[in-house]
């Protein structure tokens, strides 16, 4: 077949195959055009999931009558004029492909009016064939009407899903837009009935967050806002216990544009690390802002992907920002406490450095109420400052556990508790977040009372996290040591792996590897991380090189180290049926409040739960 120039209509239909995947793609392109035109209100009318009708009306700047034919021609745009503009583009659209592509596969009408014009104008296109520009009554702004999508491309139309499915894709994209632009009012109708309205609000509004993702997400989300190196990351991340089975609540925006990026997703997953239960996904709404010249948005026709010019810097910035935010999720902290004042907001102060108590040898049978035990190093009752002076704290405990006048003693000589509850200070502002221990349930759970109600703590999970964080701090302070191999190893690798090893020699050395390149496809390994001396060095090194090539860094060594320390902490934690004394339980609560990530154990399970007095009252139908 001879080479020939394709007709314009066919060219547009081929372009539509990249830009117009389904009705949601049409809505995305048209609404983004409206926002680029300065619209503050957008009305979206749909019929049959957008297959029969998509109508987008906005109150933006409008289009002049003489520019209407130009607006639906290929590669015509008002947003860029030079390569410099393309490299620093800040608008959502810039290719000039959307309108002609959509018009080539639908019955298309474009109507618009400039604010200073006496009347509007309209242009009709059917299957890519232009009509005449005609005057029309129209409010300032633009209306785009798309009817019978893919009417002239039956092969594309038959691949569309059911009406409910197509509508669901549109609603999901509108949710994403509503999160990014809370200042814009969005009104949606389907088959002639109003289906959703997003009211305009303040930028980064908590109200819009709850309206879009639900009150559960908004109630426990942590606010993040950090700047550095010309970057700013802000938004919300869900606390680890609010995890998902899928990635349906992961929203990333780069300079206001909703995108998917593997590097950032990897950084977020790493930040959640050992606080997320196995197989669960984090939820977040994150806005990354940077100079447009540092990111290439001209990567994908639908602009779903971007390419960062400093991908490693972005990865590290996101990872460290979120890791620091999640580290403040101490047990007892409310979402509002985290990131606003850190430990100081919880009244913890220097507790983290002091540990809130010290370990002593197990008192065994000589310790009243200690039980049989399982090698648990019991807690000395020395506590870090909690807002109460030492004499006040001791008086509070004495008031709680001292026998009432004339009370009998148990057979083991311990006093029978009077049942008077917490001391008078229990409802004062000086009560620590996890309150004071009241009892132990089945040797597994600590029951404590705080100002809001009942606190239930899984003592093994909590102690496991405390021990784990202390082990990590100890190892972080001494760094990773390298252990020389008795017989240096020659490793056959691919050329790309060898190039990575040579380029990242300093990074590998910091991880404990001493490696030199001995050939185009071979490496000479002289030492490996001492902590992982029993691991398979060949498999470990290949994994690390793969991480460095894909993400610019590797936490595989740290992850393997953390798994080892986690196992050590798990074996050293207090076991079920170990009876703790009240001072031991309270010391454990204080250490939880002072320990980073103590809301989850090393495996991502929750360590504590709060039941407010109002919730408990509802169980018993009180106040009704």
Curated annotation (Swiss-Prot):
PROSITE patterns on file: DNA_MISMATCH_REPAIR_1
A Gene Ontology biological process term: mismatch repair
InterPro entries given in the database record: DNA_mismatch_repair_CS (IPR014762), DNA_mismatch_repair_MutL (IPR020667), DNA_mismatch_S5_2-like (IPR013507), HATPase_C_sf (IPR036890), MutL/Mlh/PMS (IPR002099), MutL/Mlh/Pms-like (IPR038973), MutL_C (IPR014790), MutL_C_dimsub (IPR042120)
GO cellular component: mismatch repair complex
Top-level taxon of the source organism: Bacteria
GO MF annotations, alphabetized: ATP binding; ATP hydrolysis activity; ATP-dependent DNA damage sensor activity; mismatched DNA binding
One Pfam family of this chain: MutL_C
Key words of the record: DNA damage, DNA repair
Keyword DNA repair: yes
Intrachain S-S bonds: none
PANTHER family: DNA MISMATCH REPAIR PROTEIN MLH, PMS, MUTL, DNA MISMATCH REPAIR PROTEIN MLH1
UniProt cross-references to NCBIfam families, sorted A to Z: mutl, PRK00095.1-2
Function in brief: This protein is involved in the repair of mismatches in DNA. It is required for dam-dependent methyl-directed DNA mismatch repair. May act as a 'molecular matchmaker', a protein that promotes the formation of a stable complex between two or more DNA-binding proteins in an ATP-dependent manner without itself being part of a final effector complex.
Family, per entry: Belongs to the DNA mismatch repair MutL/HexB family.
Protein name: DNA mismatch repair protein MutL
Highest classification ranks of the organism: Bacteria, Pseudomonadati, Pseudomonadota, Gammaproteobacteria, Lysobacterales
Name of the gene encoding the protein in the UniProt record: mutL
């Amino acid at each position: 077949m001879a080479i020939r120039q394709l007709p314009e209509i066919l060219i547009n239909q081929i372009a539509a195959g990249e830009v117009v995947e389904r009705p949601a793609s049409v809505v995305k392109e048209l609404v983004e055009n409206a926002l680029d035109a300065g619209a503050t209100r957008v009305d979206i009318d749909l019929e049959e999931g957008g297959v029969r009708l998509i109508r987008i009306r906005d109150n933006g700047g409008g289009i002049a009558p003489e520019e209407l034919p130009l607006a639906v021609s290929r590669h015509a745009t008002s947003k860029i004029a030079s390569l410099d503009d393309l490299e620093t583009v800040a608008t959502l659209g810039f290719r000039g492909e959307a309108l002609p592509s959509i018009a080539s596969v639908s019955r298309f009408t474009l109507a618009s009016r400039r604010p200073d014009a006496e009347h509007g104008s309209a242009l009709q296109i059917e299957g890519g064939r232009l009509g005449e520009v005609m005057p029309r009554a129209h409010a300032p702004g633009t209306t785009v009407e798309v009817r019978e999508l893919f009417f002239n491309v039956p092969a594309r139309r038959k691949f569309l899903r059911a009406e409910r499915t197509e509508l669901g894709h549109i609603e999901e994209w509108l949710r994403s837009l509503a999160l990014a632009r809370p200042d814009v009012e969005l009104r949606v109708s389907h088959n002639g009935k109003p289906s959703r309205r997003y009211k305009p609000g303040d930028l980064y509004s908590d109200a819009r967050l709850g309206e879009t993702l639900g009150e559960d997400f908004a109630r426990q989300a942590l606010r993040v806002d950090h700047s550095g190196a010309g970057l700013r990351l802000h938004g919300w991340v869900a606390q680890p216990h609010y995890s998902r089975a899928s990635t349906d609540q992961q929203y990333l925006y780069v300079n206001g544009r909703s995108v998917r990026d593997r590097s950032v997703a990897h950084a977020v997953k790493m930040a959640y690390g050992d606080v997320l239960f196995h197989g669960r996904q984090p939820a977040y709404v994150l806005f990354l802002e940077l100079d447009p010249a540092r990111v290439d948005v001209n990567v994908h026709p639908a602009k779903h992907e971007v390419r960062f010019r400093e991908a490693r810097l972005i990865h590290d910035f996101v990872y460290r920002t979120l890791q620091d935010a999640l580290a403040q999720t101490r047990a007892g902290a409310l979402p509002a406490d985290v990131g606003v004042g850190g430990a100081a907001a919880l009244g913890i102060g220097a507790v983290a450095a002091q540990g809130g108590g010290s370990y002593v040898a197990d008192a065994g049978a000589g310790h009243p109420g200690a039980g049989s035990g399982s090698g648990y190093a019991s807690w000395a009752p020395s506590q870090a400052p909690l807002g109460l002076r030492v004499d006040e704290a001791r008086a509070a405990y004495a008031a709680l556990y001292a026998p009432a006048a004339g009370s009998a003693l148990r057979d083991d000589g311990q006093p029978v508790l009077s049942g008077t509850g917490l001391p008078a200070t229990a409802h004062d502002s000086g009560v620590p977040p996890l309150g004071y221990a009241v009892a132990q349930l089945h040797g597994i759970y600590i029951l404590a009372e705080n100002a809001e109600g009942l606190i239930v703590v899984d003592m093994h999970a909590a102690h496991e996290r405390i021990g784990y964080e202390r082990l990590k701090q100890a190892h972080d302070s001494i760094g990773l040591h390298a252990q020389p191999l008795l017989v240096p190893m020659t490793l056959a690798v691919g050329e790309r792996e060898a190039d990575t090893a040579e380029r990242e020699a300093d990074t590998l050395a910091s991880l404990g590897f001493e490696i030199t390149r001995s050939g185009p496809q071979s490496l000479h390994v002289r030492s490996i991380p001492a902590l992982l001396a029993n691991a398979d060095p060949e498999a470990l090194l290949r994994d690390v090189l793969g991480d460095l090539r894909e993400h610019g860094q590797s936490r595989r060594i740290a992850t393997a180290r953390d798994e080892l320390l986690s196992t050590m902490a798990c074996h050293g934690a207090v076991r079920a049926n170990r009876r703790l004394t009240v001072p031991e339980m309270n010391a454990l609560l204080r250490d939880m409040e002072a320990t980073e990530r103590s809301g989850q154990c090393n495996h991502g399970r929750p360590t504590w739960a709060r039941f407010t007095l109002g919730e408990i009252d509802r169980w018993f139908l009180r106040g009704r």
